[in-house]
Amino acid sequence: SLRLRLPKIDAKEIQLEGNIKEYPLILISKSSMRLSSGAAGSPPFMIKAVEDTVLKKNMGLVDIHPQTAGKMGLGEDETALLTTPRGAAEVMIHLDEGTMPGMVVISQGLGHTAYGAYLADKGVNFNQLMGPVKDPLTGQNTAWGINAKLSKV
């Protein structure tokens, strides 16, 4: 009989950027069918179709579990400062029961500074707040995520 034998690997646990005591939340991004998540901006008609749980006027929203928001004294539609080791941005709070406690979720495809007045300065560019998480064994990117904090503005 053939047996597959894999070598024993002493892999380290993957660590997100940022001290968890200073940045107690985990920030991840989400994609939307209505927004281009790449370098190109979304067409204006798609921006009009974006839900108001993602973008209100020019303010980008983040999803956070009501329990987590409550511990921080934050409520629906309140403005907060989202800070990571890589940067900070003003965001609006959207309470979402579907978001895991301790997590903050931000939409991809917003925060462009070009592409005309209709797309520029709408929401937050998540790329300025987070970076790749490298697998210590292979050096390859494993996930998007970073430690973060939210504070009332």
Task: Label each region the model flagged.
Residues 1-53:
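Long, low-complexity segments enriched in small/aliphatic residues
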Residues 40-63, 67-153:
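Long, contiguous, secondary-structure-rich segments that constitute the structural scaffold
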